[in-house]
């Protein structure tokens, strides 16, 4: 598991997390180790598929795993991040970016999520891309 670089509120505790209140309803995004996410519909899944080696994607396809279509994969590669947005009263939007190691392999992804209403996709994309790049640099010993 890769942890993003610490922000000012987490410098004292490497296991800290951040939570907030939603003013108009309940929102819960609780992803624990072992949680399975769809590769075709989630920002995490789209990033992992888009930046994986072809043989990994081929193996998943052969196993019948639902994958994002070629148009989505091309867009994720072009942008350097993936989004998932679904409208509704209690839906969550997310932006994810790949963590690339020294061998130029995608070894994971970082994501930000929040309620669909008011979610600033562009701002969150900038934040998560920068955090993923910083995490990758740290893994390579550059920070």
Indicate where each model-derived feature is located.
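Juxtadomain coupling helices with adjacent low-complexity linkers
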Residues: 65-66, 72-74, 78-82, 90-91, ...
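Short, solvent-exposed recognition segments
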Residues: 21-89
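Short solvent-exposed loop/turn micro-motifs enriched in small/polar/acidic residues
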Residues: 1-2, 90-92
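Intrinsically disordered, low-complexity terminal regulatory regions
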Residues: 1-21, 123-132, 139-143
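A cytosolic small-molecule/anion-sensing beta-strand core signal
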Residues: 11, 101, 108
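Short, glycine/serine-rich, charged loops/turns that create anion-binding
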Residues: 12-14, 22, 99, 114-117
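Histidine-centered metal-chelating micro-motifs
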Residues: 4-6, 36, 82-83, 94
């Amino acid at each position: 598991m890769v942890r993003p670089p610490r922000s000012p509120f987490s410098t004292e505790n490497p296991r800290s997390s951040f939570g907030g209140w939603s003013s108009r309803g309940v929102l819960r995004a609780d992803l624990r180790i072992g949680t399975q996410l769809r590769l075709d519909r989630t920002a995490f899944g789209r990033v992992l598929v888009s930046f994986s080696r072809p043989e990994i994607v081929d193996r998943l396809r052969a196993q019948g795993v639902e994958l994002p279509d070629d148009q989505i994969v091309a867009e994720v590669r072009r942008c350097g991040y993936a989004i998932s947005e679904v409208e509704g009263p209690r839906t969550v939007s997310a932006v994810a970016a790949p963590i690339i190691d020294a061998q130029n392999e995608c070894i994971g992804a970082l994501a930000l999520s929040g309620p669909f209403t008011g979610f600033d996709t562009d701002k969150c994309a900038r934040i998560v891309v920068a955090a993923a790049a910083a995490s990758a640099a740290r893994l390579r010993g550059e920070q």
